[in-house]
């Protein structure tokens, strides 16, 4: 999903497009570029009118590089520099759950409480951590990667997580996989 905001962070327009990640990581990048351009053009603007682009992505983000975003077929992708080059606009990239937690903390909760945890269930299972009023990134920038914690060392392994990880059990993808397995095995 792409959104166009004014300087006071008011949403002016949004545009939704499927990533088509099953076609590969380069296709995902092409679709992000397309979404940004079409959203801007639909508003009668040019990319030169845009001050900056913010991008939230799954996986660990270190200095504009995305690591372990396996559902997008990205590992060690320099997404920030790729998008800057293709869109000719400053680009800022961070983990999607970090940004969501930070947004809730700063905008919805007006900076209170000083400490909080956001947990987000979707294709994966991620989160963000606010400590002393600031986003806490932790070791290797992975403080909110809750989905990678091992819950059941004998559990299922998925294509995008470790065996028995929280994500393999409790993400939308994991829940569907477990339900499908139970139905196929005749469990009630």
Residue spans of the language-model regions?
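Glycine-rich phosphate-binding loop and adjoining helix at the ATP-binding site
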Residues: 21, 25-37, 41, 48-53, ...
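Short, glycine/acidic-enriched capping/hinge loops at junctions between secondary-structure elements
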Residues: 2-3, 65
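Short, basic/glycine-rich phosphate-binding loops at helix/coil junctions
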Residues: 11-13, 59-62
